[in-house]
Amino acid sequence: MGSLSPLEPLFTPLRIGAFALQHRVVQAPCTRMRSTKESDGIWVPNDLNVEYYAQRASKGGLMLSEATPISRDAAGYPGVPGIFTPSQIEGWRKVTNAVHTKGGLILCQLWHVGRATTPGFLGGKTPLAPSDIPISGKALDGNVYADAPPRPMTVDEIKEVVLEYAAASKRAIEAGFDGVEIHGGNGYLLDQFLHDNVNNRTDAYGGSIENRSRIVLEIISAVTEAIGAERVGIRLSPYNYFQDTRDSNPQKHWGYLCTQIASLPESSRPAYVHMIEPRFDEILDESEKISALETMQEVVKPSLDGLRSSLKKGGVSFIAAGNFKPENAGEKLITDSADAIAFGRLFISNPDLPRRLKEGIELTKYDRSTFYGATPPEKGYTDYPFAQ
């Protein structure tokens, strides 16, 4: 790829598992909170959601759905459609049909929020997590997380969640999705098991990284068995400290996990791993940021290249995400640091993003205030313009 111009690598074909892509501009999963409430804790994809995904679909392009709760007990946000009721499956089928009509591919991102919820979202139930450590601050419903600390999951409950992921993957295929992405990052349930500062278990699912990785590997095996490894990916975020997660040694610990993923039998090995790039403002705590700024010292940002290399040995593709722009996206591919690039915010405000990037058309700026719901719901959702 070294002889190509900066953006050309984004528009070369790529095969990831079962998916033959015509370009490498992937739509990242973006929670938008615009689905219809059917009953307490249950939101269903609606016609506006169909329009949103259809707008952003492209021939041979890969889309990742917004994070989608696998069960009633997995939810923690309003307006987010799940994949656990017949009406949700039917609603998603309209979305996937619309994407396929435009020649696109779409995967369902399977989600369990773990402790990132409150009883108000769970019909009064106590949130489940690896340990009884609550998130600091308030939830979206205004309740303080610490007022209802999570209950540590029993081993039987962990096994049940593994089965729920597998069952949800089958429902996703029933709804017309081309495959699934397991959400293993951003401080949600699987990430809570992985980070040693919020997992203080002393059984087979806590302590060593071998134990903390166990549920992730079990879910990968269960989901790949359910729908086929070539239709499965997983998202991880070792350096992005969402919701109080902060591991003591991400490079070592996620290095172990990636080596294990790459070493899985072919029938259980996911087609890709999707990772979020480290950011300066997230990898340092507040005192470290102040020290670095006061002394003007150079901060060496951790790299995902070692993790990418481990996965590549097993033939596992790598999708990179995290504040990519036209200026730096192609370079990531030219240096073989990733196979494809996932764009989130730019896809929100540019429904025709692949075309704009390919033709050098000016990008529309996004409005952060409309990311998570708006009045009317079309605002900042389906009203961004296409290029002329």
Swiss-Prot record:
The keyword Lyase does not apply. Flavin oxidoreductase, part of the hnx cluster involved in the purine degradation. The nicotinate hydroxylase hnxS accepts nicotinate as a substrate and catalyzes the first step of nicotinate catabolism. The major facilitator-type transporters hxnP and hxnZ are probably involved in the uptake of nicotinate-derived metabolites, and the oxidoreductases hxnT and hxnY in the further metabolism of 6-OH nicotinic acid. One of its GO terms (molecular function) is NADPH dehydrogenase activity. The keyword Cell membrane does not apply. InterPro entries: Aldolase_TIM, OxRdtase_FMN_N, Oye-like. Induction: Expression is induced by nicotinate and 6-OH nicotinate, subject to nitrogen metabolite repression mediated by the GATA factor areA, and strictly regulated by the cluster-specific transcription regulator hnxR. This is Flavin oxidoreductase hxnT. Its cofactor is FMN. It holds the Pfam family Oxidored_FMN. Keywords: Oxidoreductase. Its EC number is 1.-.-.-. It comes from Emericella nidulans (strain FGSC A4 / ATCC 38163 / CBS 112.46 / NRRL 194 / M139). Belongs to the NADH:flavin oxidoreductase/NADH oxidase family. The gene is hxnT. The lineage of its organism: Eukaryota, Fungi, Dikarya, Ascomycota, Pezizomycotina.
